[in-house]
Structure formats: structure tokens, C-alpha cells
Amino acid sequence: MKLKPGCFARSLLTVAIGATVASWSQAQENASGAQGLEEIIVTAERRETSLQDTPISVLAFGGADLEKFGIDDLGDIQHSVPNLYMRQFPNSQASLRTYMRGVGNNDVGMSTDPSVGVYIDGVYVARSIGLGSEVASLERIEVLRGPQGSLYGRNTIGGAINMVTAKPTGEFGFKGGLSAGDSSYGRGRVELDTPRVGGLAAKVSMLKSKKDGWVTNQGSGPNFGDNDSFASRVALNWQPTDDVNVDYAYDMTDADSGTIYYQTLEAPLFGFSQVPYQSDRLDDVRPSTPVQESNVKIKGHALTVAWDISENTQIKSITGYRELDQSIYQDYSANRVTTRLYANAPFDNQQDQFSQELQVLGKFLDGAVDYVVGAYYFKEKGDEDSVDYITLPLGFLPPYPPIYDQLLEIELPHRVSSAENEASAFYGHFVWTPAAMQQLHLTLGLRYSKDDRAVKSSSSSQGFEYFTSDVDDSWDNHSIDVTAAYDITDDVNVYAKFTQGYKTGGFNIRATSDYAASLPLSEETVETIEVGIKAQFLDDRVRLNAAVFSSDYEDIQLSFAVLNDPTNVALYNAGAAKIKGAEIDLTTLITDSLKLTLGYGFLDTSVDDVDNPQTPEIEQNPAVLPGAPDNSFTADLDYTFPSFGLGELMLNVNYSKVDEAEFVSFVQRGFNIPGYDLWNARLSLGELSMGHGTASIALWGKNLGDEEYLLDGIESFPWSPLVAPFGEGRTWGVDFNYEY
């Protein structure tokens, strides 16, 4: 699927580059007064530090970046971060499967954990359900690539993502925005800040978004890909004294969505000759039965209390409680014509979690050592209820003639399960800068983790119970990380680090036998060596950050759907895996008006020493790591036009390219997700005086080349070797924002 950029995309890029000629000349004349790149502050090490002083391969996106790239939810950032790969879960737009540096999870079940940790204001979010939904008042996203060791611990074996929301300003203020676009897209948001009274300030945010799906449903029910969501957030900041700061936030999301359309792409198998297929993207289909909406509701509370007990010591408490309730409908069999083939997979689950973290941050040895020590506790519980139905005419199956129209109704196993997970940890992170060598920074991190998991599950069909299972197990881990960083100059530093990572063990909640459901997974571990450089030069007009790494995984956890039976998901410790790779992030301020940002990621993955799995057919197929494209590339161009007396006119053009990637751990029928290219652009006019505030208006377009690309794939259905969803085609819209 090769990109054919539209004239609009090529024209925008040509205008942006061509317009630099006069600006470049002007910049040379005014070099002495030229501006540099802005400093980026991150909290990757649990304290505020400059991006350039943080020995981690990290990218940060502030509020302006989120608006510029049209990032409405976490899933949108993957096209701006090399070596980050995200896929929607097959039966939910709101659920994300996240892979970083080639490591991720194909399942979102309660009996296993993700490989990439996601945090909202420091609170760990255990389930990826709902991460594809919009978050109100999002201020910054930080992407930390690679295992995060002592400071984050369990389940950050691939990396971590920090989502930071806006805090109350303590002054009266208002922000609002309206958006409209094709496919009946509409979005509105408001954000209100109150003045600080008695040490208390508040921020209230609300967001409403609605859009028709990109595959029209010619039958009954919503379009495929419909979305209708509401999110709100109330944030309070209380400063009773100069030494105490209290932040509390309540957030909620309520999102309705149409099912993702899984298109039959290859010729049917096993006599399903009447099932139509098409390799090009379909724009409309006619399901055999009415399509129903899916819904996810999320609520969360977060309380952070920071107390400066002395000039060099702070105690911080982070308390979080979150709950979710999800009801999913999925139709895997809709086609352009009604075939009476019907495959439906309803799925319901609930989850709630509580976490408490206590940190002590400070300095000692006359400021030579910065430290963070802490204790962490986490508990979650939840349940799932799922069943799959297939209805088809017997004429689809030999030896029945094609005209034989009697329906065969099949109820596949009905699974009911519940899980309780508990985790605790103690950790310390110390950074020593010797007084005799201020350019050297040595880091030592230590962490002890313990996990307990209990899972109950049962499987039945049409009144017959196949099995019930009631199991529990526990795991623990000691890990270290060591870093040596050296400042070659004030603007150039290099680092080398060794990090151990840990992902807790679990059980297979999708198992189809008591034996498979009762067999525990061992914990997954990794050892990573990384070498990097962070540099700014040419009067801070060029920023270059790069890293190379090598990771060795033991007992890596892989899952896959058994051939011809999508309800049978095998999960086990496959053995050892090795990942080598690199990341390069380059930002250059070519002129005061033109900024170019380039990013590149490379991965070389292999799965070695594969243990003998339970399913013999897998022995004949190579094991691979899904979500690990060899190459990923991003380019972003920002141009500010010369002033013409009315606001500030800016153009952004961004491009992303990703190589093909596997979507299953074991290649069974030879399919994968082909590589693709995407072009986006945004033309905005800002700094417009309006009343007592300022306004901006913007015209934007996404996937300007109307690229046909796949998001995922399933090759385990008996009626087709491959069904897969396409990504959204070309879209456009207009934004209006106002603040005072």
C-alpha cells in the first residue's frame, strides 16, 4: 500500500520550504539576536528535570504540540514517536495494545499485565481499556522508551507513558474550543480556572466529541467506527502553608462507539464460497443483524500531597482509585451484501483499582546526591463475561449444496472469570555528582517487587460446563539499574546505562481447558544496555538526542489465537528474545520562522530458544514479536509566516512512515500489517485579539494522501485466512479556540 500524496499535501510542503528563502537571509543578518530552542521540562525521573539532562530516551509533547498534531487521545501519539506502535483491541476502539521497542501485549485480560506502563498524574493505570478515549485538560505527554527500572518497576519492561493534566492556575481564566469537520465531526471543550481563595484554587474541564464512522452501515444500527464521548475533570489545588501542596483530581469518561469494521480481505476457506471478499477498503457494508454500540465508563480519583519538611527533603504521597465498566459488541462478519453469516462477540467487564505510593525526595552530602526512595502498594479486582456466536447457512459448508439455506447456530464457549491482583514494592534511586568531578553523574537504582494474583474462570456452552478453574500464585523480583552520564560540555552529554526490568507472571484467562487455565506464567525479565548522547549546539538552534540499545529477554510472554478457532487463545512463556535498536531525535531551528523535527527508530528482533508450546502446530512456524516494525520515521515542519498585521499565521506539515509489522506472535498463514505513510497538515491563525482575550482559528487535514492501511488482523477465522480493519481515510476539519 504505497502512499500517493495528494496535491494539497505536496503544495503545503512546497510552500513551507519555499517560504524559508527570505527568512533564511534575514536570520543570517540578525544572527546575534536569534532565538534558540525552548527548554523542555520532564518528570521522567519523578522530579522536574531538563529533557537534555535526563539520561533516558524520552520524547515530550506539550499542550501546543498536542493541538498541532491533533492528538485527542493516547493512541494518536504513535505517529509522532519512533519505536512506539499502538493497535486498537479487536473489539473496542477505546482499548489500546501498546508496544514500545518491540515489546507489548496482545491481550487486555485481567490475568496478565501490559508491558508498557501508563500513568495519569503519577497514578498507574493497570488496564489499557479506555486509553483510546479522550482525556479532558491534558497538558503534556511524556514517552519514556525502554525498561524504566527502579523508579517505575513492574510492567514497564518496554517503557512508560506519563500523561500530565493541567493544574489550577490560581487566577481566573477561561479556555474554550469548537471543532467541526467531515463525517459530521463535532467537538467542544471548556476549561475554567477560579481565583485562589483561602489557599484553594480549582479548574473545571469538560469535553464533548462526536463523529460518524468511516464505514457506513447500510443496515440497522450505528456506522462502523462511530464515536460519541464525553469527558470531564475537576482539579483542586490547596496550599494551606508555604511548605504543603495538595492536588486532588476527579476525572470521568463516558464513550459510546460503533464496532470496528473487520473486512474479509482474502478468499474464503473450507467451502465458504458465498462469503464475499475484497482487498481494497470498503466504504459501506450491510450486516446480517443490527449493529449495537459499545460503551466504556471510567472514573478516577487522584490525591497528591507534597510536604517540604526541610530545604533539602520532601515527602510525597500519591493516592489513586480508578474504576471502569465496559460493554462491547463486535461483528466480524459484515460484508457489502447480506450473506446471513453472522459472527458476534459480546464482551462485558468491570475493574477497579487502588494504589498508594509514598516517596521521600531530597539531597545529602552537601547536595552531591539526589535521591528518591519510596514504597508502593497496588490492588485491583475485576471480572469478565464473554461469549461468541456464529450463525451461517448450511449451504456454506460441504457436502451441503450452496442453495441449502437452513441456518446452523453455534454458541462458542461462554467464559466467566474474575481476578484479584495485589502488588507491593520498595525502591531507591540515587544520583551522585562527585564534588571533584562535576561533569560526572553516577546513578544507582534498586527495587524489590512482589505480586500476588488469584483467578477464577469457567467455560460452558449451551448448558454444558467444560471446566472451572480456581488458581493463585505469587512472584517476586529484585532489580537494579546503573547509569554513568558525563557532561562533555555544558550542552553535550553522553550516558551509558544497564537496566533490569520485570513483568509479573499470570494465567491464561482465555484458556479452553482446566489444565491451560491453571498453568501459571513465569515472570518476564529483561536486561538492557543503552548508550546515548544528548546535545544542543549552534546557539541552541539544533538539538540532537540519540540512543542505541540491546535488550535480552528471558521467559518472554507471547499469546496467539489458535488457527481456525479465534476463541482459543494460547499464552505461555516462549523462551528468550533479543532486541537491538536505535532512536534518533533531531530538532533544528533553521530560521526563527522555520523549525524542522525528525525522528527515526530502528528495531532488530528475534525470538530464540522457543519452548515447546501446548499447541503442536506452532512448532512448524517461527516465533516473532508483534508490533515491532524494523523502521519507523517521523518528520515535522513548522513555519511562521511574516507578520501581516493580523495575528500570527503558522503552518505545520507532518509525515510518518512505518514498516510492515506482525500482528501475531506466530506466523501461521503468512500475513502481516503492511507498512504505510501518513501526511497531516494544519494551517492556523492565532493571537487574534477578541474582547478581553485572544482567539485562534485553524484548518487541518489528516491522512491527506488518503492512504489505505491496516490497523490489525485476525487469521484464525475458518471462513477467511485474513480479516482486518482499515484505518480512517482522508479527513479535514476547522478549529476555533478562545481564551482569556
Task: Label each residue range with its predicted role.
Residues 113-115, 127, 134-145, 149-232, ...:
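Outer-membrane beta-barrel translocator/receptor signature
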Residues 302-308, 314-332, 487, 493-503, ...:
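Membrane-embedded beta-barrel scaffold of Gram-negative outer-membrane proteins
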Residues 256-268, 379-383, 452-457, 486-530, ...:
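Surface-exposed extracellular loop regions of Gram-negative outer-membrane beta-barrel proteins
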